[in-house]
Amino acid sequence: TEQMRKIFESLPLIDQDRLAGWKIPFLRDWLSHPERDKYWERTSMGDGYSKIRASAFSVGGWFDICLDGTLKNFMAMTAPSIDPAVRGGQRLLVGPWVHSISRDGKTGELDFGKGSAQDFRQLQFQWFDSRLKGLDSGIDSLAPVRIFVMGRNVWRGEREWPLARTQYRDFYLGSGGKANTRQGDGVLSAAASASDTPDRFIYDPRDPVISSDEGPYDQAAKELRPDILVYSTPPLEADLEVTGPVRAVIFAESSAPNTDFTVKLVDVYPDGRAMSLCDGIIRASFREPGKKPSNIEPGK
């Protein structure tokens, strides 16, 4: 609605709840603590994983806003330093979902088939029957890690996360300085670009790129904006599975003392659709993890 649009466009963020008609204490707390301080430390696991004696059934979705935390928790609970009995009891399930499980196989603008849906309540019963009642519920007959391979639209069992057989590959951004829009000259290649010409864009906070909802949505229309840089590979000649951690390293400068950078990994279909796979965002002042936030020097 028009009212909600005005609320979302208002500043400062901390007052948006008041404009909506009610105060949200936890949101105000979060916005009042932008740095990692004692407020956040008190809820951080830190080295507390070694004290956990219980098994955990970790469930997430490839488009879940909480997926990063879910995977990090599972990795911490299956680390070599964890007691083998506890480590062996952990399970991970990741499907083509957002923060809630799709019951009809549809997420965002894609249909992954009814086989992608899971009877989560039944899985919960099996889990608790095994872990709390000591019954043979069949849950341990499943692989410790079960992931849904999108594109092939099949479930696959694995032994660990990240997958031990992962082959990490580097791809490089390149252009002749005109990577703006999907019609520009930006390329994504396995070989580093010989050109050092920078790509430029003008960011107007009064006309931001609107985020899509959770899930896979077509980004083609957004990629026509001149404030978006697009780097694409040639059409792939063979299937390429991307399963595991994805990281983008960018070198940028800005005329502003602080700004945000967003990177999206997108799957371009033969019909021109550009379906989002994953994305990440960073505020420039937080560019050095673990260090105190600092503004950038304009032009550097």
Predicted regions and their residues:
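Active-site-adjacent alpha-helix of alpha/beta-hydrolase-fold enzymes
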Residues: 32, 68-90
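Catalytic histidine neighborhood in serine/cysteine hydrolases
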Residues: 80-106
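C-terminal, loop-rich substrate-recognition/catalytic regions characterized by aromatic stacking residues
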Residues: 2-17, 102, 108-300
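Short beta-strand/loop motif that positions the catalytic acidic residue
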Residues: 52, 58-60
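Extracellular/periplasmic catalytic domains that process cell-envelope and extracellular macromolecules
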Residues: 50-52, 84-87, 162-165
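Acidic catalytic loop of the alpha/beta-hydrolase fold
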Residues: 63-67
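Accessory cap/linker subdomain of secreted extracellular hydrolases
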Residues: 1-51
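Surface-exposed acidic, glycine-flexible loop patches that form ligand/cofactor-binding
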Residues: 45-51, 82-83, 135-139, 239-241
